């Protein structure tokens, strides 16, 4: 591991300690996790820096299957809370037929609507449970919007009446995987499904009904590694067959 990587790890720990100071105690801090590649080092850093912490997962009706080993690993080390999905799978399918799939809508506005809904739901849970600081796994190099956010406000900022702390703000995907591998941490098996131009560094555990970026080959990847899920989505929306 390079000196730069180690410096970013220490910076992440410093941000976590700042979060506890702002919250007035670790009991008022919650780590929000998707159980994706960024969440693995995020949760491990939080527990090795702060001790047992509350990890909050906003469940989805269409999550990629197979992530149980990750959840079990962290549940054995801290408290895991699942916020149930707002819709069942059938309700989600009906809703998507009504509003259109993500790939059939204007991409950025559709993403903003989804992100805003998730943020509101997380903020409401925090308010209802005495949480003053949300720890998120966002990184600046993921999108131009996030890069601009961190450039303007830093990795710790106020939003929706809460303090948001982002320990991985300066990390790259190389940092994420270097940390996970060096610590011997488990990850979702989908990240081992490398092929068709996808690697661990650019794979994502977005739900299988999420079709943003479908033209980049995600649907073809789904067909190769998760054929049953590919069949389900293309039977529901036949026009997707031409995209993978």
Features from the language model and the residues they span:
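Nucleotide-activated chemistry modules centered on ATP-dependent adenylation/adenylyltransferase
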Residues: 1-244
């Amino acid at each position: 591991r390079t000196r730069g990587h180690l410096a970013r790890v220490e910076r992440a720990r410093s941000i976590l300690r700042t979060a506890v100071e702002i919250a007035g105690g670790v009991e008022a801090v919650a780590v929000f996790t998707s159980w994706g590649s960024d969440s693995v080092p995020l949760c491990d850093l939080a527990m090795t820096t702060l001790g047992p912490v509350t990890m909050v997962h906003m469940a989805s009706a269409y999550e990629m299957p197979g992530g149980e080993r990750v959840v079990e690993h962290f549940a054995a080390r801290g408290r895991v809370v699942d916020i149930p999905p707002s819709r069942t799978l059938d309700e989600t399918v009906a809703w998507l037929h009504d509003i259109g799939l993500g790939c059939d809508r204007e991409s950025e506005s559709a993403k903003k609507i989804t992100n805003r809904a998730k943020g509101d739901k997380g903020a409401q849970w925090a308010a209802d449970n005495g949480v003053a600081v949300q720890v998120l796994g966002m990184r600046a190099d993921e999108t131009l919007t996030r890069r601009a956010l961190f450039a303007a406000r830093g990795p710790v900022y106020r939003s929706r009446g809460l303090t948001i702390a982002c320990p991985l703000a300066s990390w790259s995907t190389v940092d994420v995987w270097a940390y996970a591998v060096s610590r011997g941490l488990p990850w979702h098996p989908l990240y081992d499904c490398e092929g068709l131009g996808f690697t661990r560094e650019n794979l994502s555990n977005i739900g299988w009904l999420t079709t943003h970026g479908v033209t980049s080959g995600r649907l073809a990847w789904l067909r190769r590694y998760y054929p049953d899920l590919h069949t389900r989505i293309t039977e529901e929306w036949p026009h997707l067959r031409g995209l993978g």
